[in-house]
Every structure is written in structure tokens, then in C-alpha cells.
């Protein structure tokens, strides 16, 4: 599977916003306004990427990294949204993003938060070496099937030394 990250263009944003608002993605993220995405494209501390697959470079998702110039070396995987689930694309994207965070951005810590109800993503991140740091209990409001409630955010991270150990053990591409 050929997966490519390319900088998101302003011309991609209608598609990005529609992907965020899709019913399959909405329960797991807090959608942004278009202007927030524009800011992430323009702000030097952020990286906004469109994920493309195959020779045809078909758009399949997008990614937002924040803290790319953080003086503490703490880069956040702010958002990873895919159009299609269950094909290994999320894992492939996470692996590319880890390599980018630790090799290109020289991160000390690569972190994210994931909604507790998003068990599939939690298990993916855990299997890719991310460690649970804690939970922000009932910190996000969710509406599911018309019912209003709260979900917790799970904060996870991977440190550079943990990533390098995974590379040494052959769990990451060198």
C-alpha cells in the first residue's frame, strides 16, 4: 500500500471539512470550522497534511500536527481522520507520522488524545507504542443517537527513546 502525506491546500478544505462532519467520523472528533483549518495550514507551528493513496494519489484522509516548533520537543498528533476504515491505512499513517515526528521534527515526545469511546483508535495507538499517560474524565460533550452525554479523553505519548528502541527491535522502519 502506497501512502503519501502532502501539505493540505486551501482548495482541499471543503473536502476536509466534509470528511470531519461525516457520520462515521463525527463521534470521534470535535469538528473544526474551515477557518481553523486555514489557520493550521498557515501557522508555522502546525502541519496540515492530506493523505493520498496509490498511483492515482486518491485523497483518503487528513492529518494535523501541532507543536512542530515547540521548544520542549513535544509534538501533538492533533487529528487523524480517514475516509475508509479497516484497511490498515491508519496504522500506515501513524508509522509515517512517528518517523516524521522523531526524525524530521526532532521531537522528544509525540503525543495525542483519543476519546475513550474510540476503542479502535486507542488500540491502534497502544499497539504502535504509545503509552497511556492519563485520562481527562468526562471532558468532552458528545451527542450519540440524540442522547447527550460526556466522554473522557485518554492522553497517550511516545518518547524518542521508546521510538528508537522500537527501531532497534525492528518494530519501526529505520
Predicted regions and their residues:
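A short, glycine- and basic residue-enriched loop/turn
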Residues: 72-74, 122, 133-140, 153
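Conserved GNAT acetyl-CoA-binding A-motif
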Residues: 103-113
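Conserved catalytic-core motifs of GNAT/GCN5-like acyltransferases
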Residues: 111-114, 131-149
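Conserved catalytic core of the tyrosine transesterase superfamily
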Residues: 112-115, 150-158, 174
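Conserved active-site alpha-helix within GNAT-family acetyltransferase domains
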Residues: 91, 116-134
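Acetyl-CoA-dependent GNAT
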Residues: 7-11, 17-86, 91-94, 99-105, ...
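Intrinsically disordered, low-complexity coil segments
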Residues: 53-60, 142-151
Amino acid at each position: 500500500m502506497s501512502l503519501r502525506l502532502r501539505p493540505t491546500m486551501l482548495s482541499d478544505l471543503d473536502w476536509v471539512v466534509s470528511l470531519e462532519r461525516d457520520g462515521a467520523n463525527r463521534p470521534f472528533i470535535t469538528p473544526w470550522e474551515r477557518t481553523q483549518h486555514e489557520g493550521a495550514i498557515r501557522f508555522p507551528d502546525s502541519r496540515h497534511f492530506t493523505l493520498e493513496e496509490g498511483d492515482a494519489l486518491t485523497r483518503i484522509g487528513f492529518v494535523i500536527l501541532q507543536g512542530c516548533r515547540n521548544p520542549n520537543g513535544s509534538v501533538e498528533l492533533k487529528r487523524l481522520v480517514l475516509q475508509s476504515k479497516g484497511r490498515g491505512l491508519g496504522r500506515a499513517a501513524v508509522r509515517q507520522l512517528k518517523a516524521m515526528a522523531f526524525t524530521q521534527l526532532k521531537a522528544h515526545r509525540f503525543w495525542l488524545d483519543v476519546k475513550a469511546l474510540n476503542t479502535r483508535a486507542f488500540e491502534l495507538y497502544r499497539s504502535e507504542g504509545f503509552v497511556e499517560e492519563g485520562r481527562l474524565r468526562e471532558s468532552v460533550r458528545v451527542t450519540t443517537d440524540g442522547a447527550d452525554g460526556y466522554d473522557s479523553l485518554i492522553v497517550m505519548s511516545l518518547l524518542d527513546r521508546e521510538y528508537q528502541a522500537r527501531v532497534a527491535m525492528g518494530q519501526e522502519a529505520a
